[in-house]
Amino acid sequence: MPRPPERDPIVQLDGPLTSVAWSSAFVAQSLEVLFVYIAPDGAHHLRPIHAETLRIGWPPDRKPGEIVMEAVERYELTPVLVHSTSWRHGEGRLILTYVAAVEPPADLTHYLADERVARADLARGDAFGPPPEIGVAQVLEHAFRHLAWLVKDDAVVGDRLSDWAGFLDRYEPEPFRAFGPGA
């Protein structure tokens, strides 16, 4: 049977987001992407149907923000702001977490699950080490506290998240919590 011409593929598949494999046995750095949006009932986290968060292999020659934007596009979301919010060591690799603030999706791809975000206590370690466990709810809490600070301190973030100001007012910016309320 003759092979179809390359310009007329039988099935068009999207290429991989990165060429770096993601595997629990692969020691490397990886990106964690938290897609979030604001709805009348509060914040929502869009996660892959197969996992708590989206994890993407991150080759050292690529800019992480570009990889995150490719993921936003892949899941057919409309970005508002993409920002690195935290990092941690876990599962034998460095995990850099990005929060991707997106518009509420009109039609959600069947590859994503939509979950309402609840408040959580932050994971805290001791003076010489990280917390023994860090859950997704704690990473999201940290991300919203980080954005609550940036929306007031960074003009670009403040402009892009102006519609989020009322929601973010509920979060005490993390750098100032130690000084007491309203510091």
Question: Model features per residue range: what roles?
Answer:
Residues M1-Q29, Y37-A39, F176, G180-A183:
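Actinobacteria-biased recognition of intrinsically disordered, low-complexity terminal regions
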Residues P2, W22, F26-V80, S86-R93, ...:
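Conserved Nudix-box catalytic region and its N-terminal flanking loop in Nudix hydrolases
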Residues H45-I56, R88-A183:
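Nudix hydrolase/Nudix homology domain
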